[in-house]
Amino acid sequence: MTKIEAAIQEYADWGSVIGVDTLEKLRNVTESGRIISLINLCEARQERKYAEIANQIYWKRDDCRIVMMSGPSSSGKTSSSLRIAQQCRVLGLTPKVIELDNYFVDREKTPRTEGGEYDFEALGAMDIAFLGEQLEALLLAQRLHH
């Protein structure tokens, strides 16, 4: 089973546990006015996941100095990174979150898709050299200038 398949199965199992494993049951929750409670429960579960990730980072802190997160544009990487960083702070760590949005090249240098749209998913859309310099500075515990 791939990691994606395992994640899908985990969420399907959790949906069964909380009694919301079909669209009909979700509609019933919504119509009965219990949607805020469900949202709060989902948020609490997600926060628990962030805490688990922070624990893994804490226990590997001597061997791992950089943690990276990947995903497509607008998938929640920055928000998740900030929440994981907060959980790391609870454990006494001092994380530095780097938002990759700050490393895009100037618009005129951004690659375009075949349809002429800006391709922010392309590696060429990022200033990789500058990002590398910043990561190296972080590893050397230097102050970042942007």
Describe the role of every protein-language-model region:
Residues 67-69:
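Hydrophobic anchor at the beta1->P-loop junction of P-loop NTPases
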Residues 79-84, 99:
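Hydrophobic positions on the alpha1 helix immediately C-terminal to the Walker A/P-loop
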Residues 57-64:
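Phosphate-binding P-loop
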